[in-house]
Amino acid sequence: MFDRDETPAELPAGPGSAPDRPALEALLKARVPAPPADLQHALNHNQIACKTWLLDALFGTLGGRFGTVSLLGGWYGVLGALLLGDARFQVDRVLSYDIDPNCARVARGLNREHVAKGRFEALTADVCELDYTGLNGSSDGRAQGAAGNGAAGDGTQGADLVINTSCEHMAPTSAWYDGVPPGTLQVHQSNDYFDCPEHVNCVADLEAFKADLPMGEVLYQGSMARKRYTRFMLIGRK
């Protein structure tokens, strides 16, 4: 039986003044043809709370101006929609990578307006195989590395910010993290929800998370207690 944290999120009562409220409103009103059954899970209270926490901490730590933001394990593009719709942020584009080929269609649907403006793309890729020195989205929805098999001379530079909120789903961490260039700005989340079968790389606490993701400079570290688990977040430079 699901508790409230695992039910679909809704807008808070009252008009509200939070800068991310319009983004959440647009996201919850978005319609995707033949939506997958687990889309509601991607929009539940836990998911939205953890992503809102990320945006608040990101803005407070690094400000709101970014060029290219790469989302690893981006799933259905919920974080991308919230980021691009948040008035505090000026982001050129978001590239959302997920190994599941079924995610891209849904992510593009939730980010339809941003896709039309060239500010969002969902790409099917194994993040352990990405060339993080230069990421480029191809028109057919497959990931390409600008320093690898991307179009020569297209001027694409590496991501200004790399975000992975799915660290608990990816093991070992080194498989994807070793490819991120030193000095890269990054935001990562994990949790201690060991009882979830899909979580193959949980951490016991914030210190364990820091040990698993060694950063040259930690700019923010924090935890958020939820009913079934605690969420951990790190912001910094590799």
Q: Which residues does each PLM region occupy?
A:
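Conserved SAM/SAH-binding beta-strand->alpha-helix loop
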Residues: 99-102
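C-terminal substrate-binding/active-site "lid" region of AdoMet-derived donor-dependent transferases
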Residues: 172-234
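S-adenosyl-L-methionine
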Residues: 2-65, 105-156
